[in-house]
């Protein structure tokens, strides 16, 4: 009598054996050492770089660094002849740089490994003994490990950092957010994130003063809002309009319950724009960078900016809603930084504008000055707490990291701010800001 589990066990055994026999052929194994001369062309962040022979124009795998002896393995988009700035669209090891003579290797077991020269493991694809036979760069910038049937075992599209190429997604069960770079020199996670939430896409700022990230944008209603179900995927798409030659609609499509829906049209360049990526910048702004491979000179351009007066497409936001618009502190009106709010009134704004630092948590050591007709970047996309004004102030008093509070007398709504940055001028004089300042 045949055991009821015999057939499934036998099939599993043969499947395991077939995977173990599917080795990377010797002519497809690689080992690249991070050494030698640097490239000569302009790159983002004023980096130095070493190209690797894994490419599909205009994409190429490289080592690059912005600080001595601290390299990132990355994919760039641009080609040398175009005199266009090389931009980084994917990174393997943000925050864990490798040094000179580090190695990138794909052995016969099919695991792609980035290691220091002493063998210390820095990053890997986790694909050992999973049937990988080849590494390949696809025309869309997706670097993939393939099995003998040409199916993806691993793909770079599954691990975005601060950028999404056309066809790349944020997805439930995988990476659900983009995170900004800290600075041009420092390649670690920065304070900004673009997050796929259950029913919308939101931008957050994480301040050292705040216990949790502060939301400063949540997609407009004409982006998309999910009333039933949950967002499972958001994908950057480029749809060529056959009625308009090569004009391309660049959209953020969204998926709910397995069905993809058309999202907001962010931009509509009048040429084939499939070589586009969405970037969450160091400054917390969202931009589309588009590369026109039919142009020899300066083929790369910005085709969308979220916080920008120039891209008035209906899917953009006022620059005044952008936390970084007026630096550490300032009042913004009609996209311009117009004043520095002080206890003596509104003074001329400059980049040196800054609220006075309160060094003590004792309420007797500080007071507040009032600024009328203002909102904070928190107020538009975060629900205020229903409190009396004196209770709102008390809440700020009890928080040593609170720098001020914002209050709307109509509705008795309170927002406590652990970061000031850009204040927004509004016509309603019942919208008030109270800035904490030391007693002299």
What are these regions (language model features)?
Residues 2-440:
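Beta-rich ligand-binding surfaces for carbohydrates and other polyanions
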């Amino acid at each position: 009598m045949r055991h009821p589990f015999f057939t499934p066990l036998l099939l599993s055994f043969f499947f395991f054996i077939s995977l173990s026999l599917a080795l990377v052929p010797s002519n497809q194994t690689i080992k690249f050492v991070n050494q030698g001369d640097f490239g000569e062309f302009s790159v983002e962040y004023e980096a130095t770089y070493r190209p690797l022979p894994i490419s599909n124009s205009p994409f190429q795998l490289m080592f690059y660094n912005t600080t001595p002896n601290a390299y990132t393995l990355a994919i760039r988009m641009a080609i040398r002849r175009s005199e266009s700035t090389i931009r980084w669209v994917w990174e393997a090891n943000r925050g864990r740089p490798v040094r000179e003579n580090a190695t990138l290797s794909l052995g016969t077991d099919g695991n792609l490994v980035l290691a220091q020269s002493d063998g210390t493991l820095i990053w890997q694809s986790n694909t050992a003994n999973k049937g990988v036979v080849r590494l390949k760069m696809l025309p869309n910038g997706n670097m993939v490990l393939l099995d003998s049937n040409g199916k993806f075992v691993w793909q770079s599209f599954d691990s975005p950092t601060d950028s999404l190429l056309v066809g790349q997604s944020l997805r439930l069960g995988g990476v659900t957010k983009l995170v900004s770079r800290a600075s041009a020199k420092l390649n670690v996670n920065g304070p900004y994130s673009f997050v796929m939430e259950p029913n919308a896409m939101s931008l957050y700022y994480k301040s050292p003063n705040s216990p949790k990230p502060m939301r400063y944008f949540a997609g407009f209603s004409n982006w998309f809002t999910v009333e039933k179900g949950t967002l499972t995927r958001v994908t950057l798409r480029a749809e060529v309009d056959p009625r308009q030659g090569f004009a391309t609609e660049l959209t953020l499509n969204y998926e709910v319950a397995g069905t993809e829906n058309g999202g907001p049209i962010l931009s509509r360049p009048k040429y084939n724009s499939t070589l586009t990526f969405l970037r969450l910048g160091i400054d917390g702004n969202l931009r589309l960078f588009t590369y026109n491979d039919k142009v020899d000179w300066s083929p790369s351009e910005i085709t969308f900016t979220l916080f920008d007066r120039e891209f008035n497409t209906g899917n953009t936001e006022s620059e005044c809603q952008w936390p970084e618009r007026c630096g550490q502190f300032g009042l913004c009106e009609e996209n311009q930084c117009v004043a520095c709010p002080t206890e003596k009134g509104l003074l001329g704004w400059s980049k040196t504008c800054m609220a006075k630092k309160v060094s003590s948590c004792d309420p007797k050591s500080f007071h507040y000055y009032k600024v009328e007709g203002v909102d904070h970047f928190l107020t538009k996309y975060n629900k205020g707490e229903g409190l009396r004004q004196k209770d709102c102030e008390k809440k700020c008093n009890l928080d040593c990291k609170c720098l001020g509070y914002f209050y709307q007398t109509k509705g008795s709504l309170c927002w406590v701010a652990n970061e000031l940055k850009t204040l927004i001028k509004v016509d309603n004089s019942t919208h008030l800001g109270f800035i904490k300042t030391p007693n002299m």
